[in-house]
């Protein structure tokens, strides 16, 4: 197996299994070492044996980025976990040395563990493989390298969904949201103003009435007593003796205005165009 071959599927999980019957279906059980010896990690005849197995099923979306063999007194690193056990009822795995792995999403890395091998202790070497350590008389080796993530497969669509998408009946339009805070009520208009704003027909458009004023059509002219001041070129000096203090009644009498002209202008009837 070459490291340069990027088409190799990476290892997605590792575990312990008593035999092929307890080993999950998508796992491969390592029954023999590279030098032909039995890969049973249990040396006794009374105890049930257990084997190292691995999987390359990527349906779970995870891959093994690294493998470590640590002692029972060692501390497992952050992001690592011990491999699961699929054993018979009375079987157990020795805890003197344990295998831990680091699982990562398949799309987050470009290199991962590609293969695992076992050899008998101090008897053979595996080219291009990394030695992880010895366990119960075996040496664990792993091969790391680049891999190509599987191409995403399109999910099958149901025919009913395709027919529904071709239907001419479009989805119902969304209903307008009702405001939680209704707009404030418009201010009340006085009786005189309401009469002036109404058109001759008696029907008033809200968009038009807001722009109508009682001063529409009334020409602007200055009072005669102010015309002499505006026409003179010399600025007259106002002394304190010219200031007259007026009472409230004098001001009301001077500026009293009945709006008679404006009422007549508002009541004017526009001539209708005869055909």
Curated annotation (Swiss-Prot):
GO cellular component: cytosol; ESCRT I complex; late endosome membrane
Boundaries of every UMA domain copy: 215-266
Keywords, ordered alphabetically: Cytoplasm, Endosome, Membrane, Protein transport, SH3-binding, Transport
Keyword Disulfide bond: no
Domain MABP, chain residue ranges per copy: 8-146
Pfam families: DUF2464
Membrane disposition: Peripheral membrane protein
Biased composition (Pro residues): 171-186
Cross-referenced Gene3D superfamilies: 2.100.10.50
Single Gene Ontology MF annotation: SH3 domain binding
Subcellular location: Cytoplasm; Endosome; Late endosome membrane
SH3-binding, short sequence motif: residues: 152-157
Region (Disordered): 170-200
Family stated for the protein in its record: Belongs to the MVB12 family.
Self-association state and partner proteins as the record states: Component of the ESCRT-I complex (endosomal sorting complex required for transport I).
Function: Component of the ESCRT-I complex, a regulator of vesicular trafficking process. Required for the sorting of endocytic ubiquitinated cargos into multivesicular bodies.
Name the UniProt record assigns to this protein: Multivesicular body subunit 12A
